[in-house]
């Protein structure tokens, strides 16, 4: 049996801080908004789905206790449908969609799948896992911050600072150019916010070039995980996901 994506929607992106455009809401409310939007676009198909799978990294606080189940109840999805959350770090949402696809291909029902992460509500590393800082872990199994890993990978692959700046500038330019086009047709306004709040349309090659590498201070705290390796730090806040 084949699996198909009938439709896809997402909320507009808000800044990950207490005064961000979406911060007054809760994760299950965002999912509820998307379920309603899907219903409007698919003649009620969302409420005929047999289950909901959500990928979520920070499964504590507002995103704890199986946020997929909370979202299902909030959205009024069928009582006999399943709901579960999974964590595959930054690939959680994609993993949820992949899992849904495999379930459909093996004879399962139509499924709603995606991800939710509200960093204005649940901060990065909020689960305080031992993996992040426990010195008893062998060095090769230690956590290395994503920014530090990116610097190491850029050095290993020979990605220059100029290339990083160019990629960041292209990303910002594409974001700005997409406004008002079919490229954002899947985006759902929420709470009066109808544009990507973290976007930096004023970004220029000159402003990126003026930024200093931002993550060198992470090297010493994670020296053991790096097994003594010294890294040529290249990434700046201009290359990082805007939050």
Where does each model-flagged region fall?
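Short glycine-aspartate micro-motif
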Residues: 3-6, 109-113, 243
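N-terminal extracellular/periplasmic Venus flytrap/periplasmic-binding protein-like
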Residues: 9-12, 23-24, 29-33, 166-243
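Glycine-rich loop/linker segments at domain edges
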Residues: 11-18, 101-157
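Conserved catalytic cysteine-centered active-site region
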Residues: 25, 56-109, 127-128, 141-148, ...
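Short glycine-/acidic-enriched loop or helix-start segments at secondary-structure transitions
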Residues: 63-64, 122-124, 193
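Active-site-proximal alpha-helical scaffold in enzymes
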Residues: 87-116, 154-183
């Amino acid at each position: 049996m084949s699996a198909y994506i009938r439709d896809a929607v997402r909320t507009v992106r808000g800044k990950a801080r207490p005064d961000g455009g979406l911060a007054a809401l809760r994760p299950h409310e965002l999912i509820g908004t998307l379920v309603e939007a899907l219903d409007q676009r698919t003649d009620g198909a969302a409420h005929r789905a047999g289950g909901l799978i959500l990928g979520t990294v920070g499964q504590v606080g507002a995103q704890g206790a199986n946020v997929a189940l909370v979202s299902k109840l909030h959205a009024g999805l069928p009582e006999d449908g399943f709901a579960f959350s999974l964590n595959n770090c930054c690939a959680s949402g994609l993993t949820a969609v992949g899992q849904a696809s495999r379930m459909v291909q093996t004879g399962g029902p139509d499924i709603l799948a995606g991800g939710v992460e509200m960093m204005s509500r649940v901060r990065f590393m909020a689960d305080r896992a031992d993996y992040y800082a426990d010195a008893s872990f062998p060095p090769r199994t230690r956590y290395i911050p994503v920014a530090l890993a990116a610097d190491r990978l850029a050095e290993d692959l020979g990605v220059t600072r100029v290339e990083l700046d160019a990629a960041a500038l292209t990303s910002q330019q594409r974001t700005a150019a997409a406004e008002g086009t079919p490229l954002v047709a899947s985006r759902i306004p929420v709470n009066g916010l109808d544009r990507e709040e973290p976007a930096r349309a004023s970004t220029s090659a000159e402003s990126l070039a003026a930024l200093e590498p931002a993550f060198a201070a992470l090297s010493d705290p994670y020296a053991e995980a790096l097994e003594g390796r010294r890294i040529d730090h290249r990434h700046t806040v201009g290359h990082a996901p805007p939050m």
